[in-house]
Curated annotation (Swiss-Prot):
Its cofactor is Mg(2+). InterPro entries: Ac/propionate_kinase, Aliphatic_acid_kin_short-chain, Aliphatic_acid_kinase_CS, ATPase_NBD, Propionate_kinase. Gene3D superfamilies: 3.30.420.40. GO terms for cellular component: cytosol. Pathway: Amino-acid degradation; L-threonine degradation via propanoate pathway; propanoate from L-threonine: step 4/4. Its EC number is 2.7.2.15. The record marks 175, 236 as: Transition state stabilizer. It comes from the Bacteria. GO terms for biological process: acetate metabolic process; anaerobic amino acid catabolic process; L-threonine catabolic process to propionate; threonine catabolic process. This is Propionate kinase. Belongs to the acetokinase family. TdcD subfamily. GO terms for molecular function: acetate kinase activity; ATP binding; metal ion binding; propionate kinase activity.
Amino acid sequence: MNEFPVVLVINCGSSSIKFSVLDASDCEVLMSGIADGINSENAFLSVNGGEPAPLAHHSYEGALKAIAFELEKRNLNDSVALIGHRIAHGGSIFTESAIITDEVIDNIRRVSPLAPLHNYANLSGIESAQQLFPGVTQVAVFDTSFHQTMAPEAYLYGLPWKYYEELGVRRYGFHGTSHRYVSQRAHSLLNLAEDDSGLVVAHLGNGASICAVRNGQSVDTSMGMTPLEGLMMGTRSGDVDFGAMSWVASQTNQSLGDLERVVNKESGLLGISGLSSDLRVLEKAWHEGHERAQLAIKTFVHRIARHIAGHAASLRRLDGIIFTGGIGENSSLIRRLVMEHLAVLGLEIDTEMNNRSNSCGERIVSSENARVICAVIPTNEEKMIALDAIHLGKVNAPAEFA
Protein backbone atom coordinates (compact mmCIF):
# COMPACT_ATOMS: atom_id res chain seq x y z
CA MET A 1 0.00 0.00 0.00
CA ASN A 2 1.26 3.50 -0.85
CA GLU A 3 2.16 5.65 2.16
CA PHE A 4 0.28 8.55 0.55
CA PRO A 5 -2.42 6.92 -1.63
CA VAL A 6 -4.39 9.05 -4.06
CA VAL A 7 -7.35 8.32 -6.32
CA LEU A 8 -7.29 9.39 -9.96
CA VAL A 9 -10.81 10.10 -11.23
CA ILE A 10 -11.26 10.06 -15.00
CA ASN A 11 -14.32 11.26 -16.93
CA CYS A 12 -13.94 10.70 -20.68
CA GLY A 13 -16.54 12.58 -22.70
CA SER A 14 -17.20 12.55 -26.42
CA SER A 15 -14.30 14.96 -27.05
CA SER A 16 -12.76 15.64 -23.63
CA ILE A 17 -11.24 14.11 -20.52
CA LYS A 18 -11.91 15.71 -17.15
CA PHE A 19 -9.71 14.44 -14.34
CA SER A 20 -9.13 14.93 -10.63
CA VAL A 21 -6.60 13.59 -8.16
CA LEU A 22 -7.98 13.17 -4.64
CA ASP A 23 -6.26 12.31 -1.38
CA ALA A 24 -7.63 8.88 -0.42
CA SER A 25 -7.63 9.79 3.29
CA ASP A 26 -10.03 12.74 3.10
CA CYS A 27 -10.96 13.12 -0.60
CA GLU A 28 -9.37 16.57 -0.77
CA VAL A 29 -8.71 17.54 -4.39
CA LEU A 30 -4.96 17.81 -4.99
CA MET A 31 -5.08 18.44 -8.71
CA SER A 32 -7.64 18.68 -11.50
CA GLY A 33 -7.89 19.60 -15.14
CA ILE A 34 -9.33 18.98 -18.56
CA ALA A 35 -8.07 17.78 -21.91
CA ASP A 36 -10.44 19.11 -24.57
CA GLY A 37 -10.76 18.99 -28.33
CA ILE A 38 -9.68 15.35 -28.43
CA ASN A 39 -9.34 13.87 -31.93
CA SER A 40 -9.05 17.37 -33.37
CA GLU A 41 -6.11 19.58 -34.26
CA ASN A 42 -7.10 21.98 -31.48
CA ALA A 43 -6.66 19.47 -28.63
CA PHE A 44 -5.28 21.05 -25.44
CA LEU A 45 -4.66 20.31 -21.77
CA SER A 46 -5.37 22.69 -18.90
CA VAL A 47 -4.29 21.82 -15.34
CA ASN A 48 -5.68 23.50 -12.22
CA GLY A 49 -7.35 26.20 -14.29
CA GLY A 50 -4.06 27.17 -15.92
CA GLU A 51 -3.28 28.27 -19.46
CA PRO A 52 -4.29 25.64 -22.05
CA ALA A 53 -1.30 23.84 -23.59
CA PRO A 54 -1.56 22.13 -27.00
CA LEU A 55 -1.48 18.34 -26.94
CA ALA A 56 1.20 16.70 -29.07
CA HIS A 57 -1.03 13.65 -29.57
CA HIS A 58 -4.74 14.25 -30.05
CA SER A 59 -6.13 10.80 -29.13
CA TYR A 60 -7.56 9.72 -25.76
CA GLU A 61 -4.38 7.71 -25.21
CA GLY A 62 -2.24 10.76 -26.00
CA ALA A 63 -4.28 12.97 -23.68
CA LEU A 64 -4.03 10.49 -20.80
CA LYS A 65 -0.28 10.20 -21.34
CA ALA A 66 -0.06 13.98 -21.00
CA ILE A 67 -2.16 13.83 -17.83
CA ALA A 68 0.08 11.08 -16.41
CA PHE A 69 3.11 13.26 -17.17
CA GLU A 70 1.53 16.14 -15.22
CA LEU A 71 1.06 13.78 -12.26
CA GLU A 72 4.68 12.68 -12.57
CA LYS A 73 5.89 16.30 -12.48
CA ARG A 74 4.08 16.67 -9.15
CA ASN A 75 5.43 13.37 -7.77
CA LEU A 76 1.93 11.88 -7.72
CA ASN A 77 2.26 9.08 -10.28
CA ASP A 78 3.60 6.50 -7.86
CA SER A 79 0.92 7.43 -5.32
CA VAL A 80 -2.00 6.47 -7.58
CA ALA A 81 -3.55 3.57 -5.66
CA LEU A 82 -6.95 3.58 -7.37
CA ILE A 83 -8.52 4.87 -10.57
CA GLY A 84 -12.24 5.66 -10.80
CA HIS A 85 -13.91 5.99 -14.19
CA ARG A 86 -17.25 7.67 -14.83
CA ILE A 87 -19.16 5.47 -17.27
CA ALA A 88 -22.14 7.07 -18.97
CA HIS A 89 -24.38 4.02 -19.41
CA GLY A 90 -24.49 0.68 -17.62
CA GLY A 91 -27.76 -0.48 -19.13
CA SER A 92 -29.67 -2.91 -16.93
CA ILE A 93 -26.51 -4.98 -16.34
CA PHE A 94 -24.79 -2.73 -13.80
CA THR A 95 -26.77 -1.96 -10.66
CA GLU A 96 -23.75 -0.63 -8.78
CA SER A 97 -20.12 0.34 -9.27
CA ALA A 98 -17.71 -2.45 -10.15
CA ILE A 99 -14.00 -3.26 -10.13
CA ILE A 100 -12.93 -3.32 -13.77
CA THR A 101 -12.17 -6.79 -15.12
CA ASP A 102 -12.20 -8.23 -18.63
CA GLU A 103 -15.80 -9.33 -18.03
CA VAL A 104 -16.82 -5.83 -16.90
CA ILE A 105 -15.18 -4.32 -19.99
CA ASP A 106 -17.03 -6.81 -22.23
CA ASN A 107 -20.33 -5.90 -20.56
CA ILE A 108 -19.68 -2.16 -20.92
CA ARG A 109 -19.03 -2.80 -24.60
CA ARG A 110 -22.31 -4.76 -24.83
CA VAL A 111 -24.39 -1.81 -23.59
CA SER A 112 -22.38 0.86 -25.42
CA PRO A 113 -24.84 1.09 -28.36
CA LEU A 114 -27.19 2.73 -25.82
CA ALA A 115 -24.72 5.64 -25.43
CA PRO A 116 -22.27 5.37 -28.33
CA LEU A 117 -20.80 8.88 -28.07
CA HIS A 118 -19.77 8.45 -24.45
CA ASN A 119 -19.35 4.76 -23.61
CA TYR A 120 -16.81 4.07 -26.33
CA ALA A 121 -14.85 7.10 -25.10
CA ASN A 122 -15.10 5.69 -21.56
CA LEU A 123 -13.67 2.38 -22.81
CA SER A 124 -10.78 4.23 -24.47
CA GLY A 125 -10.04 5.84 -21.12
CA ILE A 126 -10.06 2.50 -19.32
CA GLU A 127 -7.76 0.84 -21.85
CA SER A 128 -5.30 3.74 -21.85
CA ALA A 129 -5.26 3.92 -18.04
CA GLN A 130 -4.55 0.18 -17.83
CA GLN A 131 -1.46 0.70 -19.98
CA LEU A 132 -0.28 3.80 -18.12
CA PHE A 133 -0.97 2.50 -14.60
CA PRO A 134 -0.43 -1.28 -14.78
CA GLY A 135 -1.51 -3.17 -11.68
CA VAL A 136 -3.58 -0.29 -10.27
CA THR A 137 -7.14 -1.26 -9.31
CA GLN A 138 -9.66 0.51 -11.53
CA VAL A 139 -13.34 0.99 -10.75
CA ALA A 140 -16.26 1.77 -13.07
CA VAL A 141 -18.96 4.08 -11.68
CA PHE A 142 -22.08 4.19 -13.82
CA ASP A 143 -24.27 7.26 -14.30
CA THR A 144 -27.29 4.97 -14.63
CA SER A 145 -26.77 2.46 -11.81
CA PHE A 146 -28.42 4.47 -8.99
CA HIS A 147 -31.71 4.34 -10.92
CA GLN A 148 -31.72 0.55 -11.31
CA THR A 149 -33.86 0.35 -8.15
CA MET A 150 -36.81 1.81 -10.09
CA ALA A 151 -39.80 -0.52 -10.40
CA PRO A 152 -40.97 -1.64 -13.88
CA GLU A 153 -43.96 0.71 -13.71
CA ALA A 154 -41.49 3.60 -13.36
CA TYR A 155 -39.08 2.60 -16.12
CA LEU A 156 -41.31 1.07 -18.82
CA TYR A 157 -42.62 3.03 -21.80
CA GLY A 158 -46.15 2.40 -23.09
CA LEU A 159 -44.76 0.75 -26.22
CA PRO A 160 -45.10 -2.79 -27.62
CA TRP A 161 -43.43 -5.24 -25.25
CA LYS A 162 -41.07 -6.51 -27.96
CA TYR A 163 -39.18 -3.21 -28.01
CA TYR A 164 -38.30 -3.65 -24.35
CA GLU A 165 -37.65 -7.37 -24.56
CA GLU A 166 -35.66 -7.37 -27.81
CA LEU A 167 -34.07 -3.90 -27.87
CA GLY A 168 -33.89 -2.87 -24.22
CA VAL A 169 -36.06 0.20 -24.80
CA ARG A 170 -36.85 1.51 -21.31
CA ARG A 171 -36.07 4.43 -19.03
CA TYR A 172 -32.58 4.25 -17.47
CA GLY A 173 -32.06 7.73 -16.01
CA PHE A 174 -28.83 9.68 -15.67
CA HIS A 175 -26.99 11.97 -13.22
CA GLY A 176 -27.15 8.99 -10.87
CA THR A 177 -23.78 9.66 -9.25
CA SER A 178 -24.84 13.23 -8.45
CA HIS A 179 -28.28 12.22 -7.17
CA ARG A 180 -26.72 9.54 -4.96
CA TYR A 181 -24.09 11.89 -3.48
CA VAL A 182 -26.55 14.71 -2.86
CA SER A 183 -29.21 12.48 -1.31
CA GLN A 184 -26.62 11.03 1.08
CA ARG A 185 -25.53 14.51 2.11
CA ALA A 186 -29.20 15.54 2.49
CA HIS A 187 -29.83 12.78 5.02
CA SER A 188 -27.07 14.29 7.13
CA LEU A 189 -28.06 17.94 6.65
CA LEU A 190 -31.75 17.32 7.37
CA ASN A 191 -31.06 14.77 10.12
CA LEU A 192 -33.00 12.02 8.36
CA ALA A 193 -32.66 8.26 8.69
CA GLU A 194 -31.67 6.98 5.25
CA ASP A 195 -34.06 4.02 5.52
CA ASP A 196 -37.01 6.25 6.45
CA SER A 197 -36.92 9.33 4.24
CA GLY A 198 -38.37 10.94 1.14
CA LEU A 199 -36.46 13.42 -1.01
CA VAL A 200 -36.77 15.03 -4.42
CA VAL A 201 -33.39 16.07 -5.83
CA ALA A 202 -33.25 18.63 -8.65
CA HIS A 203 -29.93 18.47 -10.51
CA LEU A 204 -30.09 21.64 -12.59
CA GLY A 205 -27.33 22.45 -15.04
CA ASN A 206 -27.01 22.64 -18.81
CA GLY A 207 -28.28 19.08 -18.51
CA ALA A 208 -30.97 18.72 -15.85
CA SER A 209 -32.94 15.98 -14.15
CA ILE A 210 -35.18 15.28 -11.17
CA CYS A 211 -34.92 12.19 -8.95
CA ALA A 212 -37.30 10.86 -6.30
CA VAL A 213 -35.27 9.15 -3.55
CA ARG A 214 -37.27 6.98 -1.14
CA ASN A 215 -35.40 5.43 1.78
CA GLY A 216 -32.08 6.10 0.07
CA GLN A 217 -33.06 4.53 -3.25
CA SER A 218 -34.04 6.07 -6.58
CA VAL A 219 -37.68 5.26 -7.32
CA ASP A 220 -38.26 7.65 -10.23
CA THR A 221 -36.29 10.07 -12.37
CA SER A 222 -37.07 12.44 -15.21
CA MET A 223 -34.48 11.39 -17.81
CA GLY A 224 -35.28 8.31 -19.84
CA MET A 225 -33.52 5.96 -22.23
CA THR A 226 -31.41 8.97 -23.18
CA PRO A 227 -30.72 12.27 -21.37
CA LEU A 228 -33.24 14.00 -23.66
CA GLU A 229 -36.40 13.12 -21.73
CA GLY A 230 -37.78 15.16 -18.87
CA LEU A 231 -36.91 18.76 -18.08
CA MET A 232 -36.27 21.45 -20.63
CA MET A 233 -32.51 22.10 -20.60
CA GLY A 234 -29.88 24.36 -22.11
CA THR A 235 -30.24 23.04 -25.66
CA ARG A 236 -32.46 19.96 -25.14
CA SER A 237 -36.21 20.12 -25.53
CA GLY A 238 -37.05 17.71 -22.73
CA ASP A 239 -40.50 16.12 -22.94
CA VAL A 240 -42.05 16.74 -26.35
CA ASP A 241 -45.01 15.15 -28.12
CA PHE A 242 -43.69 12.66 -30.70
CA GLY A 243 -46.67 13.58 -32.85
CA ALA A 244 -45.50 17.20 -32.92
CA MET A 245 -42.09 16.14 -34.24
CA SER A 246 -43.73 13.83 -36.79
CA TRP A 247 -45.78 16.79 -38.02
CA VAL A 248 -42.67 19.00 -38.19
CA ALA A 249 -40.96 16.30 -40.27
CA SER A 250 -43.89 16.14 -42.69
CA GLN A 251 -43.94 19.92 -43.09
CA THR A 252 -40.19 20.51 -43.41
CA ASN A 253 -38.91 17.28 -44.99
CA GLN A 254 -36.33 16.98 -42.23
CA SER A 255 -34.86 13.55 -41.57
CA LEU A 256 -34.88 11.72 -38.24
CA GLY A 257 -31.24 12.72 -37.83
CA ASP A 258 -32.13 16.37 -38.47
CA LEU A 259 -34.87 16.30 -35.84
CA GLU A 260 -32.62 14.53 -33.35
CA ARG A 261 -30.13 17.37 -33.77
CA VAL A 262 -32.90 19.95 -33.30
CA VAL A 263 -34.23 18.49 -30.03
CA ASN A 264 -30.73 17.90 -28.62
CA LYS A 265 -28.74 20.90 -29.84
CA GLU A 266 -31.13 23.68 -30.90
CA SER A 267 -33.97 23.58 -28.38
CA GLY A 268 -34.51 24.27 -24.68
CA LEU A 269 -33.44 27.63 -23.28
CA LEU A 270 -31.61 28.40 -26.52
CA GLY A 271 -34.53 27.43 -28.72
CA ILE A 272 -37.15 29.53 -26.93
CA SER A 273 -34.97 32.55 -26.13
CA GLY A 274 -33.15 32.65 -29.47
CA LEU A 275 -30.38 34.17 -27.40
CA SER A 276 -28.31 31.63 -25.47
CA SER A 277 -28.31 28.27 -23.70
CA ASP A 278 -26.37 29.86 -20.81
CA LEU A 279 -28.71 30.75 -17.96
CA ARG A 280 -26.34 33.49 -16.78
CA VAL A 281 -26.85 35.29 -20.09
CA LEU A 282 -30.60 34.77 -19.89
CA GLU A 283 -30.84 36.03 -16.30
CA LYS A 284 -29.12 39.25 -17.34
CA ALA A 285 -31.58 39.54 -20.24
CA TRP A 286 -34.45 38.74 -17.83
CA HIS A 287 -33.60 41.81 -15.75
CA GLU A 288 -33.25 43.88 -18.93
CA GLY A 289 -36.79 42.97 -19.98
CA HIS A 290 -35.95 40.62 -22.87
CA GLU A 291 -39.35 38.97 -23.44
CA ARG A 292 -38.19 35.69 -24.96
CA ALA A 293 -35.47 35.27 -22.35
CA GLN A 294 -38.15 35.75 -19.70
CA LEU A 295 -40.41 33.25 -21.46
CA ALA A 296 -37.58 30.70 -21.70
CA ILE A 297 -36.89 31.00 -17.97
CA LYS A 298 -40.59 30.79 -17.07
CA THR A 299 -40.96 27.65 -19.21
CA PHE A 300 -37.82 26.15 -17.65
CA VAL A 301 -39.18 26.84 -14.15
CA HIS A 302 -42.66 25.52 -14.97
CA ARG A 303 -41.19 22.20 -16.17
CA ILE A 304 -38.97 21.91 -13.08
CA ALA A 305 -41.85 22.57 -10.69
CA ARG A 306 -44.17 20.18 -12.51
CA HIS A 307 -41.59 17.38 -12.41
CA ILE A 308 -40.74 17.99 -8.74
CA ALA A 309 -44.42 17.75 -7.80
CA GLY A 310 -44.91 14.69 -9.98
CA HIS A 311 -41.88 12.91 -8.57
CA ALA A 312 -43.08 13.60 -5.03
CA ALA A 313 -45.99 11.26 -5.82
CA SER A 314 -43.49 8.37 -5.84
CA LEU A 315 -42.65 9.00 -2.17
CA ARG A 316 -44.50 7.96 0.95
CA ARG A 317 -43.84 11.43 2.34
CA LEU A 318 -41.83 14.45 1.22
CA ASP A 319 -39.11 15.45 3.70
CA GLY A 320 -37.14 17.77 1.48
CA ILE A 321 -36.46 19.22 -1.96
CA ILE A 322 -32.78 19.60 -2.78
CA PHE A 323 -31.28 21.91 -5.41
CA THR A 324 -27.91 20.99 -6.91
CA GLY A 325 -25.92 21.32 -10.15
CA GLY A 326 -24.51 24.51 -11.65
CA ILE A 327 -27.90 26.27 -11.87
CA GLY A 328 -29.43 24.69 -8.77
CA GLU A 329 -26.47 25.77 -6.64
CA ASN A 330 -25.84 29.23 -8.11
CA SER A 331 -29.12 30.71 -9.34
CA SER A 332 -31.12 32.27 -6.52
CA LEU A 333 -33.62 33.45 -9.17
CA ILE A 334 -34.43 29.95 -10.40
CA ARG A 335 -34.71 28.58 -6.86
CA ARG A 336 -37.05 31.42 -5.88
CA LEU A 337 -39.26 31.01 -8.94
CA VAL A 338 -39.46 27.23 -8.51
CA MET A 339 -40.34 27.53 -4.83
CA GLU A 340 -43.02 30.13 -5.58
CA HIS A 341 -44.41 27.79 -8.23
CA LEU A 342 -44.62 25.02 -5.63
CA ALA A 343 -46.55 26.96 -2.98
CA VAL A 344 -49.20 24.23 -3.24
CA LEU A 345 -46.75 21.92 -1.42
CA GLY A 346 -46.32 24.41 1.41
CA LEU A 347 -42.96 25.81 0.31
CA GLU A 348 -41.88 29.15 1.74
CA ILE A 349 -38.58 30.81 0.94
CA ASP A 350 -36.01 32.28 3.32
CA THR A 351 -34.89 35.13 1.08
CA GLU A 352 -31.71 35.90 2.99
CA MET A 353 -30.49 32.28 2.91
CA ASN A 354 -31.53 31.84 -0.71
CA ASN A 355 -29.59 34.91 -1.79
CA ARG A 356 -26.36 33.80 -0.14
CA SER A 357 -23.42 32.92 -2.36
CA ASN A 358 -22.84 29.28 -3.22
CA SER A 359 -19.52 29.61 -1.40
CA CYS A 360 -21.63 29.21 1.75
CA GLY A 361 -22.05 25.56 0.79
CA GLU A 362 -24.83 23.35 2.11
CA ARG A 363 -27.75 25.32 3.53
CA ILE A 364 -31.49 25.32 4.06
CA VAL A 365 -33.20 28.01 1.95
CA SER A 366 -36.81 27.52 3.09
CA SER A 367 -38.36 29.41 5.99
CA GLU A 368 -38.99 27.91 9.42
CA ASN A 369 -42.72 27.95 8.66
CA ALA A 370 -42.43 25.90 5.47
CA ARG A 371 -44.17 22.51 5.47
CA VAL A 372 -41.41 21.09 3.26
CA ILE A 373 -37.71 21.88 3.69
CA CYS A 374 -35.79 23.15 0.67
CA ALA A 375 -32.00 23.05 0.66
CA VAL A 376 -28.99 23.68 -1.54
CA ILE A 377 -26.32 20.97 -1.56
CA PRO A 378 -23.36 21.34 -3.95
CA THR A 379 -22.84 18.12 -5.88
CA ASN A 380 -19.48 16.38 -5.99
CA GLU A 381 -19.50 13.55 -8.51
CA GLU A 382 -15.71 13.24 -8.43
CA LYS A 383 -15.79 12.62 -4.69
CA MET A 384 -18.56 10.03 -5.07
CA ILE A 385 -16.54 8.21 -7.75
CA ALA A 386 -13.45 8.34 -5.54
CA LEU A 387 -15.42 7.02 -2.56
CA ASP A 388 -16.72 4.10 -4.61
CA ALA A 389 -13.17 3.33 -5.72
CA ILE A 390 -11.95 3.54 -2.12
CA HIS A 391 -14.76 1.26 -0.92
CA LEU A 392 -14.24 -1.38 -3.60
CA GLY A 393 -10.46 -1.08 -3.44
CA LYS A 394 -10.48 -1.61 0.34
CA VAL A 395 -8.75 1.67 1.19
CA ASN A 396 -9.94 3.42 4.37
CA ALA A 397 -12.82 5.73 3.49
CA PRO A 398 -13.46 9.19 4.98
CA ALA A 399 -15.66 8.87 8.08
CA GLU A 400 -18.65 10.75 6.62
CA PHE A 401 -19.20 8.06 3.98
CA ALA A 402 -17.61 5.03 5.67
